[in-house]
């Protein structure tokens, strides 16, 4: 972990960094442009919604998103950043979008005509392929929708998914020709910079980096970020040490398994030794 004086830019792939850049900056175009590029849309504006979505009944569990936003005409976007591999992350994405669709249901007479829901996953691990033989090692953005199996005709435009393999992205800066590639490159490499790099002639990335600059944050924000990163590395080191010695900590294993099952960090913290903050850092 870097010393405070050595941090130039925050990591956009950790919870604090992602929300600082995309959610708290007030610069909604920083998330609008990636959504437009990845999903082929033409969004002009979005409203950032409450990240926690309660169940429709007392018995249903709540869903908490990293970011939830909507357009004026009701298109919904769920954005999730995931650092630790989860066996059922795809299923979790389906659960989140299904919950969002359920909340669009109207009382009284309703003909099931709801506005589209989009899910964007930013991953620090390799995507799991149900059909590995079809996987393209040079593909880092994976898009899914509802289609007919044989002809690939679209069944509906109401539900779409995109998963970005940030950690696996291995293109050099000079190889990044599209906005999507450049976005992936900056998301992965930003916290490694020791000096401001020469980037593409695009004001988007200038604003992105300005918002992510560690020196631009208040002292309180800097301390929160350092605490977040320390917890992340401490917990990672604990897991690495336990695995290397063949003595994996039972509480850590339990927490990871519960994350894979889709339990929230709050629920896991009540049942295991790791704190809620440590669990969120996974």
Where in this protein do the model-derived segments appear?
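Low-complexity, glycine/alanine/valine/leucine- and proline-rich hydrophobic stretches
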Residues: 148-157, 164, 178-187
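Generic structural signal for hydrophobic core residues of well-folded globular domains
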Residues: 25, 38, 123, 167, ...
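Short, charged alpha-helical interaction segments and adjacent helix-coil junctions
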Residues: 2-7, 16, 77-82, 174, ...
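Short, solvent-exposed coil/turn linker segments
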Residues: 42, 50, 148, 165-168, ...
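Accessory alpha/beta interaction modules
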Residues: 1-161, 170-172
